[in-house]
Amino acid sequence: MQETAQEYKQRIFGYLAQNDPVKVQAATAKKLGRLISRASASKLRKQPAPGKWSISEILAHLADTEVVVSYRIRAILGAPGTPIQAFDQDKWAQAMSYGKSDPRRSLERFIAFRKANLDLLKSLSPGQWKYHGMHAERGEESIETIAKLSASHDLNHMRQIEKILSQ
């Protein structure tokens, strides 16, 4: 049974605990680079189980998720209370051929998008962190919540990558 949007949010926030989401996000790119630096191309493309993403697919997903996060934050800043559309990550993975993506190029894209997002987050006033949008599945989400979700999402996928590399 698939978890609900609220169950997902609760589970994923557990990875972040009391850590600063901006610091976690700032550290992610280097950690990902270290994790994949010595992995072979075949290891990066190997699915750990049927229907589970390879490291290459995870990296492509992380890069695309940064685009989504970037848009959501900017949309909220431009029009607080704006609707936030959900996206189907599996449909994106299929439509954009994540399985065929170059993992190192995906990491490069992720790094570029992440840097832009961190620059924006660091420029926000305390009041802007409270601006919110209305997520189609999860309801009201502030920029602060989006930053926490993004950091938690990083930690979730890094655990997956570490597990795949240890197999």
Task: Report the location of each language-model feature.
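Acidic/His metal-coordination segments adjacent to aromatic residues that form catalytic metal sites
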Residues: Y15-A17, K52, W92-R105, E137-T145
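A glycine-rich, hydrophobic loop/mini-helix early in the fold
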Residues: A27-W53
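Compositionally biased, intrinsically disordered low-complexity regions enriched in proline and serine
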Residues: K9, G14-L16, G99, I111, ...
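Residues that cap or delimit alpha-helices
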Residues: A17, S40, S125-P126
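Short, contiguous alpha-helical
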Residues: Q2-R11, R45-Q89, L118, K130-Q167
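Acidic/histidine-rich alpha-helical segments that form the ligand environment
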Residues: K23-L35, A93-K130
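Extreme N-terminal tail/first-helix region
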Residues: M1-A26
